[in-house]
Curated annotation (Swiss-Prot):
Description of how the protein assembles with itself and partners: Component of the small nucleolar ribonucleoprotein particles containing H/ACA-type snoRNAs (H/ACA snoRNPs).
Localization in the cell: Nucleus, Nucleolus
Name of the featured protein: H/ACA ribonucleoprotein complex subunit GAR1
Species in which this protein is naturally found: Eremothecium gossypii (strain ATCC 10895 / CBS 109.51 / FGSC 9923 / NRRL Y-1056)
Single GO BP term: snoRNA guided rRNA pseudouridine synthesis
Role: Non-catalytic component of the H/ACA small nucleolar ribonucleoprotein (H/ACA snoRNP), which catalyzes pseudouridylation of rRNA and is required for ribosome biogenesis. This involves the isomerization of uridine such that the ribose is subsequently attached to C5, instead of the normal N1. Pseudouridine ('psi') residues may serve to stabilize the conformation of rRNAs. The H/ACA snoRNP complex also mediates pseudouridylation of other types of RNAs. The H/ACA snoRNP complex mediates pseudouridylation at position 93 in U2 snRNA.
Family: Belongs to the GAR1 family.
Entry keyword set: Nucleus, Repeat, Ribonucleoprotein, Ribosome biogenesis, RNA-binding, rRNA processing
UniProt superkingdom: Eukaryota
Region of interest (Disordered), residue spans: 1-32, 124-212
Keyword Membrane tagged: no
Region of interest (RGG-box 1), ranges: 8-27
Length: 212
């Protein structure tokens, strides 16, 4: 997750001279260096185009761009993609400078800060709770009768249905990268994590057909 910080440059210009000492970004301080503790996140499966493909061994879901470490807190790279259904999650690591994906072997474990994990319940659709019934409007006594009610333009146009999104999943960026396929496209299986290509959610939720 990346945030763009608009530094509002160009507004100060000439003002900056007389108001010296105000520079720098100030405010938030971001954590530098490794975290205080790390937990197991994934096991190495194979390398692909310079990235590491892992099988998750954690019950939680990692943040995108979260830093991945070895057990001794040496940086390996960042989480790039999340793939597969919720009960069998895979993810890829974009290697840091100087780290080679081919240098690892099957079963090698990778670690993550516990602060960079989300509970899987965050991605499971919650059942809708029925609210209290709406009170009926009372007709005003006397006066001119209503205009007959126009029917609301065809009953809310038939409920277009979403754009094929993965209900409760990330709809990640994986897909046809020579080995990542097969875990579902954008809008793949319900509650899963999509790939980086694939059909866009079943041609966008039934957009075609004849127009009348």
């Amino acid at each position: 997750m990346s945030f763009r910080g608009n530094s509002r440059g160009g507004r100060g210009g000439a003002r900056g001279g007389s108001r010296g000492g105000r520079g720098g970004f100030g405010g938030r301080q971001f954590q530098q260096g490794p975290p205080d503790s790390v937990v197991e996140m994934g096991a190495f499966m194979h390398d692909c185009e310079g990235d590491i493909v892992c099988r998750s061994i954690n019950t939680k879901i990692p943040y995108f761009n979260a830093m991945i470490y070895l057990e001794n807190k040496t940086e390996v790279g960042k989480v790039d993609e999340i793939l597969g259904p919720l009960n069998e999650v895979f993810f890829t690591i974009k290697c840091a400078e100087g780290v080679k994906a081919s240098s690892f072997k099957d079963g090698d474990k990778f670690y993550i800060s516990p602060e960079k994990l989300l509970p899987i319940e965050r991605f499971i659709p919650k059942p809708k709770v029925a609210g209290p019934p709406k009170p009926k409007r009372k007709r005003a006594a006397g006066g001119a009768p209503g205009r007959g009610g126009f029917g609301g333009r065809g009953g809310s146009r038939g409920g277009f249905g979403g754009r094929g999104g993965a209900r409760g999943g990330f709809g990640g960026r994986g897909g046809a990268r020579g080995g990542f396929g097969g875990f579902g496209g954008r809008g793949g299986s319900r509650g899963g994590f999509g790939g980086r290509g694939g059909a866009r959610g079943g041609s966008r939720g039934g957009r075609g057909g004849k127009r009348f």
